[in-house]
């Protein structure tokens, strides 16, 4: 099952974190190398651009990006095989290194699978205990504090068009968003 496959991938990351000094350095650019815990997975699938994890949930997944096939991972697993669950992926026009807003897509499935666990944020106490999302790029660890939670109908004229905002012209525009 796909859930077991995600657990195996997460186990590889955790094992690499524990064995960090033994992992080979994999250069991504002249200036940056891939973090040791993600090197093996990147070699397995270079569409991987990061990792998302939220403590207290099952969210602990690789994050993919395929600009030329934007929704590829909506219905494909990490091994690029067909899968109803897919893999979380970043919107095609987001630049992982410089965009102000990274839109990460993933299925909302009941029973806490995939991003279904985000429903827990309806509970103020849960939010109070889980205010941080870990999102690592291949080269940097990152932690982000949740400042808002909303539910909207995507691509609806009445919905919040979060997917239209990638970069702000200035700080005021970013804050207004």
Predicted regions and their residues:
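Solvent-exposed, non-transmembrane regions of membrane-associated and secreted proteins
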Residues: 1-177
